Amino acid sequence: MHERNLIHRDLKPENIMLGLGPNSNIVHLIDFGLTRSVIDSKTGQHLPFVKNKNLIGTCRYVSINAHLGYEMSRRDDMLTLGNVMLYLFKGYLPWQSLSINKNSARFKALGEAKKWHYDNDLFDGCPPVFR
């Protein structure tokens, strides 16, 4: 996907499928509704970095950059995939229990919680591959 200059922008367990039988080692992505190109179709150039973007994707998994309002990139897909893998390994993410009703306040609180856990204890109990 990234080799084709596309970013998914909504990676989550529900959008990741495993092949069957002899193809059980193949991972398939689904739901490309938020996918976009990182290349401008008119100029052929990489899209510029932009701030103050609305959060796109599933809050539980998106990168801290998405919470900060930065344009999402391949890097954010990879960080989001890391959050998904942590969720699958641990069975939870430390920030998923936050319950704030107002979306803008919740997005901000989730971003702050993610930053704190990344800086402190997020990888506790995880194999070295997560570090």
Model-identified regions with their sequence ranges:
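Activation segment/activation loop of eukaryotic-type protein kinase catalytic domains
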Residues: 19-56
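Eukaryote-specific detector of the first structured module of a protein
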Residues: 2, 13, 58, 63, ...
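Conserved C-terminal C-lobe helix
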Residues: 125-131
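Conserved C-lobe activation region of Hanks-type protein kinase-like domains
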Residues: 21, 66-123
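Catalytic-loop of the protein kinase fold
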Residues: 2-20
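Protein kinase subdomain VIII
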Residues: 43-45, 55-70
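Anionic group-transfer/hydrolysis microenvironments
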Residues: 12, 33, 65, 79
